[in-house]
Amino acid sequence: MTEKLLHFIRTKSGSMHWWLQRFLAILLAPIILYLLFDVAIYIGQQSDPTVMMFLNRIFNHNSIFIFITSVILIWHVRGGMEVIIEDYVHGEKTRIVSIFLIRVIAIEIMEYLYKCSIIF
């Protein structure tokens, strides 16, 4: 069993990337549903809900949870965008530059989220 797993990880095919995308999607589904239900229940309990109350509930009540969800979501989007570029961009230089830029943008967004999480 361990040998099969190690062989699966070491292969240079796209199967590991495919499995990571599916895992992140499955991981994101219940997290986002939880956040939506949590906010819906909270707003339903308020007599006069406002946007600030909504944002306060999301970012102050679940700040670590939001940070982790954002990182997972950004990683999932980055992987999906790379697959789209690999499949539909035909110029080699354009493909390499596009993938590089997507990775840089994803890292910058995660750095920004980290800095924001320290502030809050």
Curated annotation (Swiss-Prot):
How this chain sits in the membrane, per its record, is: Multi-pass membrane protein
Which co-factor is required? heme
| Membrane spanning stretches | 18-38, 64-85, 96-120
GO terms for MF: heme binding; metal ion binding
Record key words, sorted = Electron transport, Heme, Iron, Membrane, Metal-binding, Mitochondrion, Mitochondrion inner membrane, Transmembrane, Transmembrane helix, Transport, Tricarboxylic acid cycle
Q: Mitochondrial matrix compartment: which residues?
A: 1-17, 86-95
Report the main location listed first in the record: mitochondrion
Q: Which GO terms describe its biological process?
A: tricarboxylic acid cycle
Entry coiled-coil feature ranges? none
Top-level taxon: Eukaryota
Detail which positions bind a ubiquinone: Y88
Cofactor info, note text:
The heme is bound between the two transmembrane subunits.
Query: Which positions are annotated as binding heme?
Result: H76
GO cellular component annotations of the record: mitochondrial inner membrane
Sorted alphabetically, which InterPro entries does this protein's record hold? Answer: SQR/QFR_C/D (IPR034804), Succ_DH_anchor (IPR014312), SuccDH_FuR_B_TM-su (IPR000701)
Biological role = Membrane-anchoring subunit of succinate dehydrogenase (SDH).
Subunit info here reads: Part of an enzyme complex containing four subunits: a flavoprotein, an iron-sulfur protein, plus two membrane-anchoring proteins.
Identify this protein by name. Succinate dehydrogenase membrane anchor subunit
